[in-house]
Amino acid sequence: MSININSEVALTYLIAKKKQTLVASLGVTFGISMYIFMNSLISGTNEYFEKMTLSATPHIRLYRDHQISNSDRLNHFLGKASTNLISNPKMVNSDERIDDPYTLLQALKTNPASLAVSPQITATIICSNGSLQENGNVSGVNILEQDKMFDITSTMIAGTVKDLSTDPNGIIIGSGMAENLSLKTGDNITLTTSKGSTKVLHVSGIFRTTIKNVDQTKCYANLSVVQQLLKKDRSYITDIYVNLKDYTKANRIGKQFELVTGYRVETWQSANEQSIAARMIRDMIANSVVITILIVAGFGIYNILNMMIYEKIKEIAILKATGFAGRHVVAIFIFQALFIGLLGSFTGILLGWLLSKTGSMIYIGKGNLEYLPVSFYAKHYIQGALFGIITSFFAGYVPALRASHVDPVEIIRG
């Protein structure tokens, strides 16, 4: 039996039931377009929040962790001859500095996985301008390395990061702090620590991240300035930030750094577990909604083909009586289902792209988010089309099997 005859019969049935064919195709179209739009929107939103996270969090942070007193030293000196216990163990008072930091910095910079490495010290301070005061924190950094990691330049609204790198007594402050203290570039600002140390700096630049808490409290100064403010020597460094060429490998590489250096490692994933959990929930919700829509579309195809078989039962019997085998009848109805799936997939891809494009033009205008974050990835369109075709195939397979088992003698007699 020629495949062309099967196709011709299938097309004849589809054309005879134009409205049902159109309704079934629209169901697939709607399902695929929503699949594409929802995935484009969710992936765009995830990328936006991930970008925001990585703009403020290093891929890997190395630091000395606080330790609880234990019996390790007693066990070392007394051996196994005695059992040593510590009653009411407490946190050990220890310096937070990293030992020989510049050697470690050089080793991390030469690591092939590293993109940028920056030392850091953070101090809690009171910033003042005359009688005006604001609580904040100042990060002592190599500002050029820090800019390479977090793109501070893109947030600057006055001055530049280079101005700070060439000014030993400069400071970059957030726009919220500048507004609250009535400061502009070139003005002086006084920093005071909890131990009473003070230092007068002048404002080299002002940044705006649109995150209110950051803009009102965050400051950047040169490493040596914060060391002087804390009355520490030039080797005093408490944190080392590392950005990787591939940030998705932070957990694996972080474990390697922890084993080699002996310092505690915090990756961007462990520092932002709630954000990652929220991303997973968003993905689950979006996929659940879209899969439900496609399943409903599949049931639509199933019902329409079932009705078509019921209405064409005599024609099917005549086909079988004239030499069509059961597999040919299956092929006819599978062809119809796939035709509906392909038609719906094609129009669904076009509608999905149109919805995504329209969505990307919706103006938000909040913070640094101007438009609705929508991504455009070919994989979403391919996945949507495949899912639509597969759903259509299975939706048509069951009715096709039913049609193939029709007994022509019984139907014609009836």
Residue ranges and their predicted role:
Residues 66, 177, 185, 190-286, ...:
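Mechanotransmission and gating elements of multispan inner-membrane complexes involved in transport
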Residues 18-45, 280-315, 338-347, 394:
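Hydrophobic alpha-helical transmembrane segments of multi-pass inner-membrane transport and secretion
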Residues 93-202, 228-230:
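Short acidic/glycine-enriched loop/turn elements at secondary-structure junctions
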Residues 42-135:
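Hydrophobic, regular-secondary-structure patches
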Residues 11, 377-414:
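C-terminal membrane-exit region of the final transmembrane helix in multipass inner-membrane proteins
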Residues 356-382:
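Short juxtamembrane loops and helix-capping segments at transmembrane helix boundaries
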Residues 306-308, 314-360, 383, 387, ...:
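Transmembrane alpha-helical interface segments in multi-pass membrane proteins
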Residues 1-8:
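Short, membrane-interfacial amphipathic segments enriched in basic
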